[in-house]
């Protein structure tokens, strides 16, 4: 066989091998693209509910409470009765801890993934009969029936939440603010240090002080007009 014929045969064999390998490469490329694309979509679907609330105006970002914060909240609930509600309950640790102390406890959370996870945790820890978790916007919920309110707030939402709770809560209610205090209310108790600090507000005592201030201001006005 001449040299030219050998070269021609080699080229034909290479062409056949190349043509048969291309579909396989193309197939694997499509599969890889599909897997990567599906993974990204799944990650987006899972991550979006966690990230979105933090980006919305006047909503609570998910920042888990520390062990010390949970203990400080429970100390402020000692000798209290009635239902405990956690506004922006996150992964449910405050609600579950309160239930373990004998309270009926409720959590409101905008993120459905966190609500489902909280329900699972409550079931796993044996307190699901004493807990309730709801997917809800805190601004659309009335808290008038609750005697013990826990809130892990952020500074920009505290003034508006202060007005809402002052309007809705009864005199027997106690509000426990974590991480940030309310701007106008005077706390009855302050416990802890740094990010673990909690501020406790008893609505009955607060309203008595407010009423006395209003009476005093009216007397001042009358004195100036006499």
UniProtKB/Swiss-Prot annotation:
Top-level taxon in the UniProt lineage: Eukaryota
Region of interest (Required for mitochondrial location), residue spans: 48-82
GO cellular component, one term: mitochondrion
InterPro entries membership: FAM173A/B (IPR026170), SAM-dependent_MTases_sf (IPR029063)
Chief location: mitochondrion
An example molecular function term from Gene Ontology annotations: protein-lysine N-methyltransferase activity
Single GO biological process annotation from the record: regulation of mitochondrial ATP synthesis coupled proton transport
Function: Mitochondrial protein-lysine N-methyltransferase that promotes chronic pain. Involved in persistent inflammatory and neuropathic pain: methyltransferase activity in the mitochondria of sensory neurons promotes chronic pain via a pathway that depends on the production of reactive oxygen species (ROS) and on the engagement of spinal cord microglia. Protein-lysine N-methyltransferase activity is dependent on S-adenosyl-L-methionine.
PANTHER family named among the record's database cross-references: ATP SYNTHASE SUBUNIT C LYSINE N-METHYLTRANSFERASE, METHYLTRANSFERASE DOMAIN-CONTAINING PROTEIN
Similarity comment: Belongs to the ANT/ATPSC lysine N-methyltransferase family.
Protein's name according to its UniProt entry: ATP synthase subunit C lysine N-methyltransferase
Organism: Xenopus laevis
Gene symbol of the encoding locus: atpsckmt
